[in-house]
């Protein structure tokens, strides 16, 4: 999972202006980096130009996804990531960056702004912080912990059963479980197995 670009743009009536951007092109060859960076800037501007105000969307280009958020006030953000990176985290990042940008940079400067004139330097740190979505996004972290717990729980159940022993056999031999509990287990087992691939 990787983020390659984070950009803030202004969608004017006739033209889209790049206000500020940050890039991580370290995974590309040295000689390709400047061309790739230019292409990302061009793609970001093109996507914002063709998006409506007040919209969020994702555009797939080969193994990359471009996530765009254009606010009603014409401020826009674009994240370019690989297709494994969670879109929800990208849109959370865009919302956070655009909100912070709009409070730190005066709205009057947006239409005429450029990367050289806009004083906002947080994009590089956001791009680096959000490289790992689990660290940056609390929901992703919780989801990863839940997945880990499920795996541990599954492994623990398998290790509790002796070699060749099945949970079905233990349930049927159990003296602790009542007939109703055994029937419930068998019904649940049948319902869960009906959808499995045989």
From Swiss-Prot:
Predominant localisation class: cytoplasm
Cellular component GO terms, alphabetical: cytoplasmic vesicle membrane; cytosol; Golgi membrane
InterPro entries, per database record: Longin-like_dom_sf, Longin_dom, R-SNARE_YKT6, V_SNARE_CC
Lipidation (S-farnesyl cysteine): 195
Keyword Endoplasmic reticulum in record: no
Annotated GO biological process: protein transport; vesicle-mediated transport
Membrane association type: Lipid-anchor
Modified residues (Cysteine methyl ester): 195
EC number: 2.3.1.-
Residue intervals of the v-SNARE coiled-coil homology domain: 138-198
Gene Ontology molecular function: transferase activity
Enzyme class: transferase
Family membership: Belongs to the synaptobrevin family.
Free-text function comment from the UniProt entry: Vesicular soluble NSF attachment protein receptor (v-SNARE) mediating vesicle docking and fusion to a specific acceptor cellular compartment. Functions in endoplasmic reticulum to Golgi transport; as part of a SNARE complex composed of GOSR1, GOSR2 and STX5. Functions in early/recycling endosome to TGN transport; as part of a SNARE complex composed of BET1L, GOSR1 and STX5. Has a S-palmitoyl transferase activity.
Domain notes: The longin domain regulates palmitoylation and membrane targeting.
Protein name: Synaptobrevin homolog YKT6
Organism lineage: Eukaryota, Metazoa, Chordata, Craniata, Vertebrata
